[in-house]
Regions:
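N-terminal binding-site loop/beta-alpha segment at the start of enzyme catalytic domains
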Residues: 1-69, 195-198, 297-299
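Acidic (Asp/Glu)-rich catalytic clusters
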Residues: 3-4, 52-66, 100-104, 131-133, ...
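Acidic-and-aromatic substrate-binding clefts and catalytic sites of carbohydrate-active enzymes
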Residues: 18-23, 42-50, 78-87, 117-121, ...
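Short, acidic/polar
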Residues: 20-32, 85-103, 124, 149-151
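Short acidic/polar active-site loop segments enriched in Thr and Asp
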Residues: 37, 106-109, 139, 163
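A short, structured active-site edge motif that brings together acidic residues
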Residues: 65-80, 110-116, 145
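CE4/NodB-like, metal-dependent polysaccharide N-deacetylase domain
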Residues: 90-112, 131-135, 187
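Beta/alpha (TIM)-barrel catalytic core signal, keyed to glycine-rich beta->alpha loops juxtaposed to Asp/Glu
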Residues: 116-300
Length: 300
């Protein structure tokens, strides 16, 4: 499996957002068995234990070793809502240790600060993770949903920049300025919510987001650009969206609880031609839609 530009994570990983612990166990095992070598989870997903059970089964049932699998999880920093206490040094360490227990691992390959909501504690959390990296509990430290201003806080203090930034990226939210900054600073780009333009993305009750009614209408349009491209290349709309990201050099984290779709998300051997990549580039609509409480990139 080809890895991302800085060799941090394999280019295609399994996302586990909104999976139950049991679903995460089932899909992690099935995905690794099929060829995935990167699993992405988070403390706030509450399914790290399921991922951990699957890993133990994989290491028992197959010849794969711990070093063959890349595991990403995330620190919930706090601060999203008033009742969401921001984590200090001690809270950050406790969260990491709990994730390691849940995963039944001695270290994680990539540990991300899940969002920039911790405002006054971002630097303290980063310092703490640097110390935990020195202790061998984390191989690579990164962030998620951080904008240029958040990253510049680290730069201004002379801290090493993150190994990766996991952000919402898809043809409707391409973030060219942030992407350029990340590339210029050798920060790996990991795209999540690649499938926002699909009509099936968060369409069930309780799956909240900032995706507008017009966006849903456009997703359902029988003549949408993605449907036309899917026909042209004889693939699914999801495969078009995922391949677009791969061809731009991003790592991706498609999530599915259906085995067939999980396999389709991995089988991306076709290529989108230059003309169609330019067509997709012109479909950008701007900001993020994944977080119902507002775009975390806008946090100061």
């Amino acid at each position: 499996m080809e890895k991302s530009s800085n060799n941090i994570v394999p280019r295609i990983g399994l996302g586990t957002y909104n999976m139950s612990s049991e679903e995460a166990e089932q899909m992690t095992y099935a995905a690794i068995d099929y060829g995935y070598r990167h699993i992405d989870t988070a403390a706030v997903y509450r399914n790290e234990d399921g991922v951990g059970r699957a890993l133990n089964r994989i290491f028992t049932d197959t010849d794969l070793n711990r070093s063959d699998i890349t595991i990403t999880t995330k620190l919930w920093p706090g601060g999203l809502l008033k009742v969401d206490r921001v984590k200090n040094n001690e809270g950050t360490i406790k969260s990491l240790e709990k994730s390691l227990r849940n995963l039944d691992l001695e270290y994680v390959d990539l540990y991300l600060i899940h969002s920039p909501h911790a405002r006054g504690k971002r630097l303290e959390q980063w310092e703490t993770l640097l110390s935990q990296q020195e202790m061998g509990k984390i191989k690579n430290i990164g962030v998620s949903n951080w904008g240029i201003n958040h990253l510049e806080e680290l730069n201004d203090k002379g801290y090493p920049l993150p190994a990766a930034n996991q952000i919402e990226l898809h043809p409707w939210s391409q973030k060219p300025e942030l992407v350029s900054y990340l590339q210029d600073n050798d920060i790996d780009i990991i795209a999540y919510s690649s499938l926002v333009p699909l009509s099936t993305w968060r369409h069930k009750d309780g799956e909240n987001s900032l995706k507008t009614d017009q966006m849903y209408k456009d997703s359902e349009d029988a003549n949408s650009p993605f449907k036309k491209l899917a026909v042209k290349y004889n693939v699914s709309e999801a495969q078009i969206l995922l391949k677009w990201a791969l061809q731009l050099g991003y790592a991706i984290l498609p999530k599915s609880i259906q085995i067939d779709r999980m396999k389709d998300n991995f089988d991306l051997t076709f290529a989108i031609d230059e003309v169609d990549m330019e067509l997709i580039e012109n479909l950008d609509r701007g900001g993020s839609v994944t977080w119902e409480y507002g775009d975390p990139l806008a946090i100061k």
